[in-house]
């Protein structure tokens, strides 16, 4: 019954799926040597719009993926305990502002670098998630396709943010050095429930961070238009 309900809730997403696969314009912009450039052929404003579009779609699909996973694999009592499962979000230690007042006070430069840190911190965990989902019995193709799509689009978003940093700040790419050892270490043969709760935490945390990426980028866009009206 839970599987049927989850599939019904996801039917509208199936209709939207071809659009999601084609609507987002690629953010890659490389020179003849294959190195990311300043993208002289596209304006800073249009590039920022494309980056925001990618972030919006990534958040939307991550929300759908988390809901689908929850419906299919998480009993309701455990849904209430997901924050007590002993798996903190992997980006918890990153120096990224969380409150509205903190976000309002940071510079455009730090807004961009905060987005880049979040994006880079999630690339490997999402690849890891795709491998762990194969352990599940009856995992729907819809969930596998969504996680794969998000993983690929996140790498595209990274490229777009890097080019945006080059354009707006005239800076080179920075790489986030963050260890996911606490999340990915193999504790022998964990129970299936432990796998499920760990992956559920991963999806929930990514959904939250994907929303934060979108918020930060939209604040940056607002500042470009009218600094005093941004809240």
Swiss-Prot record:
GO terms for biological process: animal organ development; growth hormone receptor signaling pathway; positive regulation of growth; positive regulation of receptor signaling pathway via JAK-STAT; response to nutrient levels. Residues 1-24 form the signal peptide. GO terms for cellular component: extracellular space. Gene3D superfamilies: 1.20.1250.10. InterPro entries: 4_helix_cytokine-like_core, Somatotropin/Prolactin, Somatotropin_CS. Keywords: Disulfide bond, Glycoprotein, Hormone, Secreted, Signal. Glycans are attached at residue 145. GO terms for molecular function: growth hormone activity; growth hormone receptor binding. Belongs to the somatotropin/prolactin family. This is Somatolactin-1. It comes from Sparus aurata (Gilthead sea bream).
């Amino acid at each position: 019954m839970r599987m049927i309900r989850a599939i019904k809730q996801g039917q509208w997403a199936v209709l939207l799926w071809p659009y999601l696969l084609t609507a987002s314009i690629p953010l890659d912009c490389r020179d003849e040597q294959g190195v990311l450039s300043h993208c002289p052929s596209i304006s800073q404003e249009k590039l920022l719009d494309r980056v925001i579009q990618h972030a919006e779609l990534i958040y939307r699909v991550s929300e759908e993926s988390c809901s689908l996973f929850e419906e299919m694999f998480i009993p309701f009592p455990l849904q209430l305990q997901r924050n007590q499962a002993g798996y903190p979000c992997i980006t918890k230690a990153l120096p990224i502002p969380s409150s509205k007042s903190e976000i309002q006070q940071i510079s455009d430069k730090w807004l961009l670098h905060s987005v880049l840190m979040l994006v880079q911190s999630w690339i490997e965990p999402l690849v890891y998630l795709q491998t762990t989902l194969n352990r599940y019995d009856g995992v729907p193709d819809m969930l596998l396709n969504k996680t794969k799509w998000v993983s690929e689009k996140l790498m595209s978003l990274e490229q777009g943010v890097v080019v945006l940093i080059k354009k707006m700040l005239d800076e080179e790419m920075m790489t986030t050095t963050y260890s996911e050892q606490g999340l990915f270490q193999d504790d022998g043969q964990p129970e299936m429930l432990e796998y499920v709760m760990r992956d559920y935490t991963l999806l929930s945390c990514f959904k939250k961070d994907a929303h934060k990426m979108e918020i930060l980028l939209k604040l940056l866009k607002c500042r470009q238009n009218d600094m005093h009206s941004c809240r």
